[in-house]
Every structure is written in structure tokens, then in C-alpha cells.
């Protein structure tokens, strides 16, 4: 995994972090890369320092999701698709969950809607803010180009507040994530929306076709820590993974399962790390977020 850093402040901070991880935790899989050697990591432009973490991994998220679903069903659980929950009514020692097709009585409810929570469960809604993020995939690149932009076949990201992240697929497509929106609407053309972010790093790909573009909604918290907890002893929830959901949502699921089954000190520890609520309530949360995100986007453009 390679993180490429933009701006002098970020370089200083991450040099210190590399030193801290190596000294305090004896973690020798991470190293810093100064500017003259960055071309060994990628042909991307506009970067001043890099961090390489040889102890990290990247994976295929869809295959991982399908694998988790298979494991759940193998263990005896049932999965019901197209069963959107419309209401959760908490009683003294159970909850009544309503869908379009059924009403279910449950002793415990696990709520992990993240950016898709909407108005389903107001008690926890103000702890998160939904935002949209977008990804494109190029046409298959020739071997020389692929080796030039990502010779280590690593997963890469930069240090901008509105982060860009990318990797190569098995058939040498560049899969590039970049750009955010803060309304409930997606861009008319995701490929047109993301292309400038890609070309800012790899101008050499200006003539490369973008074959696919897609997006989704995630949830952030104010301090970027996941928000875990239990409401009235019945509804366990995990949300606000802030772009790190692939590893941390799995961790949260394990903690919640253990907590429901037999109690879990680690769940109690995580749920004790309270996240601050977004100000403004249901009506003003989003405008305040847009103002803040535009400010930090401007800092990105100014190289701060």
C-alpha cells in the first residue's frame, strides 16, 4: 500500500508518523520515500513524499462481500433481499421491525445502514453525514503503461482532504476513485466528473478511454472514528466508517455479534468513544457540511 503525500504540512506529519510507528510499535513494515525516489512507486505527478506499508493488503471488495454472505448462510442465517425496513418500533425488551412484506419481532436488532440510514432511525442519524464518492475504470492499459503508473501493483492513495485512491485490476484497468458530492444526487456523467481528478495525477492518460463509472454513499463522522453503540439495550448499531468500511465494518460486526452473544469488553470500549453530533439538525446538517467540505477542498487546491 502506498500513500503519496501532497503539501509540506502533510509531509512533516507523515514523516513523524512513520518514525512513531517504527519506534513506539516496532512496526518495521512501513517506510518513508523521499521525492527523488517517488518515480519508483508511480509516474504520477504533484507529490513530495510517500509512505509504503508492506504490511497492508488490498482486496476485491465485491468478492469479499459475496464471501461474507456465503459464510453467513453456511452458518445457518437467512438473507432476505428487497426487504427494505420502513420502521423500527422499540418495546421494553424487543423491537418490532416493519418491511413492505412482513412484520418481524426481534429481541435484538443490528442496524448497519451507514450512509443509507436516511430517516429510518433518528436517534443515531445526527452522528453521521452521508456523502457520495465515485470510481471509474479505464480501458485495459498496455503493459508498459501499467508498469509505469504502478510498478509495485500496489493500492495507492493521496493525502488530500477529498482523497483520491487507485489500483490496477487483474486485466490492467486503472480503477480510480476521486471526487465527492454532498447532495442526494449523483453527477449526470460519473466518468466526466472523475476524469479531471485522474488526469491531475496521470496527465499521460488523457487519451485513455474510461469504460465504467459508478458511485455509492458512505457516512462520515466528525472525528472520522466509527460510531458504535446500543440504543435502549435492543438496537445495536455501527456506522460512520468514513471511507474505511471494508476492514472496520467487519471488525464492528464481530464486536456486535460477541456483545449480543456474551458481552464484549472491546465493544464497550469502542461504544464509549462517543462521536460528536453534526450541528444543525435534519434541515441544516447538510448545508453546514457543504460549507466545510468546500473550505477543505479549496485547501486541497491551494496545496495546503
Model segments located where?
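Single conserved hydrophobic/aromatic residue that forms the stacking wall/gate
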Residues: 1-7, 11-12
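Active-site substrate-recognition segment that forms the wall
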Residues: 85-87, 92-95, 102-233
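C-terminal catalytic lobe of FAD-dependent flavoproteins
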Residues: 55, 180, 184-187, 191-302
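General small-molecule cofactor/ligand-binding pocket signal
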Residues: 30-34, 39, 78-80, 211-213
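Conserved active-site and cofactor/substrate-binding residues in soluble primary-metabolism enzymes
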Residues: 33, 59, 63, 80-83, ...
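A short alpha-helix-loop-beta-strand transition element characteristic
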Residues: 21-35, 266-268
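Short, conserved charged micro-motifs
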Residues: 13-15, 187
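Helical element adjacent to the flavin cofactor pocket in flavoenzyme catalytic cores
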Residues: 16-20, 49-107
